Amino acid sequence: MQIGQRLGTPLSPSATRVMLLGAGELGKEVIIALQRLGVEVIAVDRYPNAPGHQVAHRAHVIDMTDPDALRALVDAERPHLVVPEIEAIATDALAAIEAAGVCEVIPTARATQLTMNREGIRRLAAEELGLPTSPYAFAQSFDEFAAAVARIGFPCVVKPVMSSSGKGQSVVRSEADIEPAWRYAMAGGRVNHGRVIVEGFIRFDYEITQLTVRAIDPASGQTRTSFCAPIGHLQVAGDYVESWQPQPMSAKALERARDIAHRVTSALGGRGIFGVELFVRGDDVWFSEVSPRPHDTGLVTLASQRQSEFELHARAILGLPVEPALATPAASAVIYGGLDEAGIAFEGVRDALAVPGADLRLFGKPESFAKRRMGVALATGANVDEARERAKRAAAAVRPVSAR
């Protein structure tokens, strides 16, 4: 594959083939962005009819934590690029695939290994790069966990070292919370059951996602780092419910946020978009986490930017130029399933789309749960406050209903 120079025709011998590992709502948008550039896309997930399966050229259902199954699928499909979109993947298999020269792993196999494990990325950020973070400790057993909580102090945040979307995450405020927090973390971790991170609680003013793009500069042919406008977001139980762009912040805080984002993404290397999560208080900024792929809070960029985070990711991994400029203030608000049922329907769509500046993305997930993210309302506005009000109004208008 000639990075940045040549794209083929899908379903032909000249095809440029990309395999996405994870075909949820974020993967679906990446697939659409790739297909607009004539890329042949193979979508892989652990369950059938995932959102990305519905729009890909080919779809597969496998256990992506099984290294043999993953390697066999890559050998069968022979993609030029493998793009992880979730955490629950056999990353050692990706490293072997990359080392053997079978295909390129985005951004790199090492970056995937580090960022899919909170321990790896925290040690890189705090211990190797010296970035500001909350105090932290790791624990493998309940006794180690209780000792870590005592050392960090109350309140503290507990997370499995491998989980996503707030699963297994809780705040420990007293002795009474310790055992329930351990049980919840054990239930929420995807792999490496039994290992958690305990983090000191930072009193922050707000959280941001600093979307950071590593792409090839067409003028120099070298990798260049660029930034989207900062995204503010509201989290409930570790899962995002609202996001907006741009998040107002001081010039010093923005400078520090981008310096942290640049340093951690440069250490990870490769091409693509990274979602760098940061805490901000006044001019002070702390590193929290980084995802080497589009970020759920970045769904707002479907309305706010000329090139969304998904288009930026697609372009960057293909070696194409990117333009991460903000077009308009915008916001997103999550639409939950509201009930536990397969094949639900949605009412109120007309009312939602009647809100000025509003749009919807209904993800097409085959099964709903009460707190599963099934869609998102987007809205633009003259400013962030207006956009947030419109997005929330549009989301509230959508009513998930039983199709039985």
Curated annotation (Swiss-Prot):
Residue positions annotated to bind N(1)-(5-phospho-beta-D-ribosyl)glycinamide are: E25, L26, E85, D296, K365, R372, R373
Extract one GO BP annotation from the record. 'de novo' IMP biosynthetic process
Q: What is this protein called?
A: Formate-dependent phosphoribosylglycinamide formyltransferase
Q: Which domain of life is it from?
A: Bacteria
* Job description of the protein: Involved in the de novo purine biosynthesis. Catalyzes the transfer of formate to 5-phospho-ribosyl-glycinamide (GAR), producing 5-phospho-ribosyl-N-formylglycinamide (FGAR). Formate is provided by PurU via hydrolysis of 10-formyl-tetrahydrofolate.
| Keyword hit for Ligase | yes
The residues listed in the UniProt record as binding Mg(2+), with positions renumbered to this chain, are: E277, E289
Kindly list the positions annotated as binding ATP: R118, K159, S164, S165, G166, K167, G168, Q169, E199, G200, F201, I202, E207
Pathway where it operates? Purine metabolism; IMP biosynthesis via de novo pathway; N(2)-formyl-N(1)-(5-phospho-D-ribosyl)glycinamide from N(1)-(5-phospho-D-ribosyl)glycinamide (formate route): step 1/1
Q: Which Gene3D superfamilies is this protein grouped with?
A: 3.40.50.20, ATP-grasp fold, A domain, ATP-grasp fold, B domain
Q: PROSITE patterns in the record, alphabetically?
A: ATP_GRASP (PS50975)
Reaction it catalyzes: N(1)-(5-phospho-beta-D-ribosyl)glycinamide + formate + ATP = N(2)-formyl-N(1)-(5-phospho-beta-D-ribosyl)glycinamide + ADP + phosphate + H(+)
Outline the extent of the ATP-grasp domain: 123-318
- EC primary class: ligase
Subunit-structure text? Homodimer.
Which GO CC terms are listed, alphabetically?
cytosol
Q: Which family does it belong to?
A: Belongs to the PurK/PurT family.
EC code(s) of this entry:
6.3.1.21
Record the organism: Burkholderia pseudomallei (strain 668)
List the Gene Ontology MF annotations in alphabetical order: ATP binding; magnesium ion binding; phosphoribosylglycinamide formyltransferase 2 activity; phosphoribosylglycinamide formyltransferase activity
